[in-house]
Amino acid sequence: SVDPVESHKGWSKDIEDVTGHAPNYPMIGDPELKVSKLYNMLPAGAGETSEGRTAADNATVRTVFVVGPDKLIKLVLAYPMSTGRNFDEILRVIDSLQLTSQKKLATPANWKPGEKAIILASVSDQDAKELFPQGWDAKKPYLRYVEVE
């Protein structure tokens, strides 16, 4: 949000008061609109600061960025102001990113931790035998489902 960090702290407290759970993730303030403009969350002509702007003026696209340990953006989810974020989906994606960064796998649609993943098509069957000695279920040559430990 383009609000200052102090405003976010108040919002976080409100969330805790209402739900019993406080957000536990980093939040930044962007009162100079630098980040919001850089990532196209506000129009380029939005001015130079959030000061003097109305709440409607400061209504950024609500965007979730997942940044990897390599400091590269791994996921961008954009939500309109009228729609709350789906934290189950955000956590599911983080689980998938962590799994697929460690193993030569991809996760299918609606995958959840504990479910089968897909061996990357770039992995030969010979290499897959070494990587996944438990075997796999090949629906197609490029679609090899494997139990994930």
Task: Enumerate the language-model features and the residues they cover.
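Chalcogenol-based redox active-site neighborhoods
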Residues: 1-149
